[in-house]
Amino acid sequence: YNVGDTKEVDLGSFGTHTVRIANMSECTNGETSETACGFVVEFADIITKQEFNSTPTNVGGWRDSELRTYVNGTIYNSLPSDLQNVITTTKVISGHGKTSGETNFETQDKLYLLSGHEVYEDGTRYQISGYDTSYSNTKQLDYYKNQGVTADSYAETIKQDDYWWLRSAGSSTTGSFLMVDSSGGWFNFGARGSASFPFGVSP
């Protein structure tokens, strides 16, 4: 197996989707989140669209979000049983928003969205580390590192020319999570977006 290898997976009512090997390297710089350590698989496409929360808040971050419940319930349960059986529980560290007193969140998840740093390294012009408080707790996944993805250069992050959520709360607001846009760039967006326009889910 190699980083970047893909395979199609039948998710029942969600249809057929593509998973890819996103990482094989171990964490060696004291990363406390296990989300980019060792063998990591991600979806190379968008499974469905969903709001992060039904109200425009990032209080409680990924840990307390409605989307985390959905991903680890509805989406996980749609996976073939042979795939469910090989997915291990992962220690997930996620960034917080501007709410007073909040620190980074720790969860134990079967499935999780990627963080800002797991996709983007800081660029020279733009830095995502200023918006993702968990930046130093994880590292860039091998797939995106091999593609040279930074906050300045990001064409290889595009999934179906659409928007998809990251799990990092936008640190400068109380109502946004980071996202990847249709051109591959990143930005803050209100956690709810709008009722009629949810964004892509790609754990």
Residue ranges, per PLM feature:
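Collagenous Gly-X-Y triple-helix signature in extracellular proteins
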Residues: 1-202
